[in-house]
Amino acid sequence: MIIHPKTRGFICTTTHPVGCEYNVLEQIQSTRARGVRSNGPKKVLVIGASSGYGLATRISAAFGFGADTLGVFFEKPGTEKKPGTAGWYNAAAFDKSAKNAGLYSRSINGDAFSDEMRAKVIEIIKSEMGGHVDLVVYSLASPLRKMPSTGEIKRSVLKPIGVAHISNAIDTNKDQIIQATVEPATEQEIADTVAVMGGQDWELWINALTQADVLAPQTRTVAFSYIGTEITWPIYWHGALGKAKADLDATSRRLDARLQALGGGANVAVLKSVVTQASAAIPALPLYIAIVFKVMKEKGLHEGTIEQADRLLRERLYREDGQPAAVDEEHRLRLDDWELREDVQATCKVIWKQVTNENLFQLTDYANYKRDFLKLFGFERADVDYDADVNPEVTFDVIEL
């Protein structure tokens, strides 16, 4: 079929398998250009491995350190009539490239919040990966979670706490600056958001892996977070999602105390703002990203997901000098350090106040934001012929759960 982008709100409803594959190949090339190191992770489990930071970290571990990787995700394959999700094509492209490079790659498609998934992962670690993993990456961003004990569905919300929040935002369909009003979360919504996006599931994973004795000595685990800046704090860090991320921090401290007994440790890694399917859904964030990208590009500080993942593994968790990573007062690895530089944020605040419909494309990197967003789904690549016939049914070595 011939596939062109179709967008609805902050979602692109079509995906391009060839474009997605090329996106993955581009990230692999970026990691390979930094050279392969041997003093790093050997056997890696990535929970949430099909897009964004999870995919980038899987690429960095495999192609930057030669690691065996097991990836868990929840994606839809394409059919004769309909393309699959971008994550399906990303995972397929990773698997193909890893196997071509002689690397061990295993993938499981299913609900990462379920006990069945944990059992399957443990079974594969024992039967195929030598019985242990030494790095567990937790990178789930989900709007809902089915509680493994009760089967109840909890949903996360992107809402402030206490009072409604009014902010500048972009209507990405009309390319217009709008005033977005977001009503505050209820107590139940806050609790449910913590249940979905907090540290509970990460801890269940580490508990299960510990009890099954599949964590190697010196195992590290990392979960991803975002703090952002004053511009986004009301909706994010000071909102329902911020409560979930605070729960993630508390979980990290508990897990770290336990893993230190094995000579390992746990950290939350705070990452920079990037264009992902998750960030596109957060009011005010696309406009802020369009501004901060312009500022960081002008200062030579810009990074995408793969550059962040490479820096996380090479300069934080697995430093060449063998020293422990620098952490903040909450024991977090900060990879938003360049974004939060005073000079960067001061410029962002000035532009935030000045931006209008008339100067949106001049003052910000909004044109590239739109391009980067469509690129997530395999579009806007100069090396892909989008009028060519393409097969949406892509198969690969994946266990369906």
From Swiss-Prot:
Involved in the final reduction of the elongation cycle of fatty acid synthesis (FAS II). Catalyzes the reduction of a carbon-carbon double bond in an enoyl moiety that is covalently linked to an acyl carrier protein (ACP). NAD(+) binds at residues 48-53, 74-75, 111-112, 140-141, 245, 274-276. Keywords: Fatty acid biosynthesis, Fatty acid metabolism, Lipid biosynthesis, Lipid metabolism, NAD, Oxidoreductase. This is Enoyl-[acyl-carrier-protein] reductase [NADH]. It comes from Xylella fastidiosa (strain 9a5c). Pathway: Lipid metabolism; fatty acid biosynthesis. GO terms for biological process: fatty acid biosynthetic process. It catalyses: a 2,3-saturated acyl-[ACP] + NAD(+) = a (2E)-enoyl-[ACP] + NADH + H(+). Monomer. Disulfide bonds: none annotated. The record marks E75 as: Plays an important role in discriminating NADH against NADPH. Pfam families: Eno-Rase_FAD_bd, Eno-Rase_NADH_b, Enoyl_reductase. Belongs to the TER reductase family. Transmembrane segments: none annotated. The active site is at Y236 (proton donor). HAMAP family: FabV_reductase. Its EC number is 1.3.1.9. Signal peptide: none annotated. The keyword Cell division does not apply.
